[in-house]
């Protein structure tokens, strides 16, 4: 089996898993905020948020980085010096920072110290989609 294709497949699986979490967690936050007066509901949302973040998103993010770096190595380090790849890496760093920010939001919701509205979480829910669009076009077309 071609090791490059194996790692590319593993990278894509990790990316899809991570993106699913990045898109779903803020939506759970919306429901959590809108139901903050209902203890039974918030208890359920807290379990969902915790499991999604710690058991799916964090491992998927780490695997995305590991397999992505392996692909850079297998392609030859020269690929790292191509502008499209540098922009992609910056965008993945932004997604990682966004992931960490969602982790902070998770903690603030758990501690009942959240000051953000459901509208805020609806808006930031679009951030990973926009970044993903740019990454996909960079990887497919390598325009620069």
List the predicted regions and their residue ranges:
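Polytopic transmembrane helical bundles with strong interfacial aromatic enrichment
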Residues: 1-144
């Amino acid at each position: 089996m071609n090791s490059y294709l194996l790692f590319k497949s593993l990278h894509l699986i990790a990316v899809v898993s991570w993106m699913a979490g990045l898109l779903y967690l803020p939506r759970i936050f919306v429901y959590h905020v809108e139901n903050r007066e209902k203890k039974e509901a918030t208890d359920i949302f807290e379990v969902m948020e915790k499991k999604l973040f710690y058991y799916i998103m964090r491992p998927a993010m780490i695997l995305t980085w590991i397999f992505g770096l392996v692909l850079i190595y297998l392609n030859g380090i020269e690929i790292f010096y191509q502008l499209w790849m540098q922009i992609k890496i910056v965008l993945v760093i932004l997604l990682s920072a966004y992931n960490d920010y969602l982790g902070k939001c998770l903690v603030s919701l758990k501690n009942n110290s959240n000051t953000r509205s459901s509208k805020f979480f609806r808006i930031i829910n679009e951030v990973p989609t926009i970044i993903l669009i740019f990454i996909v076009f960079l990887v497919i077309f390598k325009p620069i």
